[in-house]
Amino acid sequence: MASGQEKGRSELDSLAREGQTVVPGGTGGKSYEAQEKLAEGRSRGGQTRKEQMGEEGYSEMGRKGGLSTNDESGGERAAREGIDIDESKFKTKS
């Protein structure tokens, strides 16, 4: 007889195979396990980038990205609205 954890996992796997996202950050995975791996990789990728740029540069880059819309980039909107974005912080640390 399957344990409760195995049963829950198989239910999540069948939902994932139907195209639903069952793991936060696992969008696009065709199975529960695939979604777990995608979410883990995305998280690790963000952490690596944060370490490369430093806390300040990473948050500054997020500010610029948050300003973007379908019509214009974050840089264009920042310039138009007079928002100061310090791109010197974007450089990776050596």
From Swiss-Prot:
Keyword terms: Stress response
Record Pfam families: LEA_5
InterPro entries given in the database record: LEA_5, Sm_Hydphi_plant_seed_CS, Small_hydrophilic_seed_prot
Biological processes, Gene Ontology terms: response to abscisic acid
Extra facts: Wheat contains at least 10 different genes for Em protein.
Protein family according to the UniProt entry: Belongs to the small hydrophilic plant seed protein family.
Name the record gives this protein: Em protein CS41
